């Protein structure tokens, strides 16, 4: 596994990449649907990963009809999610070691997410990570959500780094599409969805966890140093 260029900055997705929250969203929406007595399946939920509410609402109406109580479900869904997060907000393996490496190498990093700033602040605060990221790009900071390139382009702009020299770390299909459209190098770390060939072709590599990423970064920089010496 190698990266095509030396890494100058890293842009992280959040849900399913930094935090093991996608499974909590899945549990919460099924519980909420049961509470309201409406249909919802894991198959339909998986279409929501890495996408904003407007997209999710459309998916619900397409799957279950225009009379589906999407807004009511959203309220119950978020209520159950917040209850689950209280005792189950787990970091993904390798997060802290990777952030330590970036500090050691002096590489800036940012988060690019479809979640709200308040959600990001809560999750980072729960694990003492609020000061580990130079910038947070969240809902409201860009015109178009993933799979459009906007979140990653805004992150690169805030970091002051050419997008081509940024490494994007993503777990979702739309996240990979977004980072690819922004011109970034991509390592996908799949969570609930395995990448089809179309998505694999957009990635420098697909890793089993964030534990694999430090070696990729150090190797890319070592190769650059050797080439310039």
Task: Label each residue range with its predicted role.
Residues 3-105:
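N-terminal helical cap/lid subdomain that shapes the substrate entry/recognition surface
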Residues 13, 17, 113, 171:
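Conserved G/P- and acidic residue-centered "switch" motifs that form tight phosphate/ATP-binding loops
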Residues 48, 112-114, 169:
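Structural motif
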Residues 15, 49, 93, 109, ...:
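Short glycine-rich loop/turn motifs that provide flexible caps or phosphate-binding loops at active sites
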Residues 18, 91, 109, 144, ...:
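Conserved SAM-binding loop
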């Amino acid at each position: 596994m190698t990266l095509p260029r030396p890494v100058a900055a890293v842009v992280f997705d959040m849900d399913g990449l930094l935090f093991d929250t996608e499974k909590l969203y899945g549990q919460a929406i099924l519980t909420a649907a049961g509470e309201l007595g409406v249909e919802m399946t894991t198959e339909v939920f998986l279409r929501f990963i890495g996408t904003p509410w407007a997209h999710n609402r459309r998916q619900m109406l397409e799957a279950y009809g225009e009379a589906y109580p999407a807004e009511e479900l959203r309220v119950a869904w978020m209520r159950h999610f917040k209850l689950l997060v209280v005792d189950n907000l787990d970091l993904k393996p390798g997060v802290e070691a990777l952030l330590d490496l970036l500090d050691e190498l002096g590489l800036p990093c940012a988060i690019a997410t479809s979640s709200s700033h308040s959600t990001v602040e809560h999750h980072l605060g729960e694990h003492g990570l609020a000061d580990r990221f130079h910038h947070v790009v969240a809902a409201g900071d860009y015109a178009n959500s993933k799979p459009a390139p906007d979140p990653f382009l805004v992150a690169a702009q805030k970091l002051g780094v050419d997008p081509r020299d940024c490494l994007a770390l993503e777990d979702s299909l739309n996240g990979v599409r977004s980072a690819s459209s922004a011109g970034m190098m991509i390592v996908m770390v799949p969570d609930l969805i395995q990448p089809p060939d179309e998505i694999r072709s957009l990635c420098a590599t697909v890793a089993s966890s964030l534990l694999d990423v430090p070696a990729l970064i150090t190797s890319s920089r070592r190769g650059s140093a050797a080439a310039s010496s």
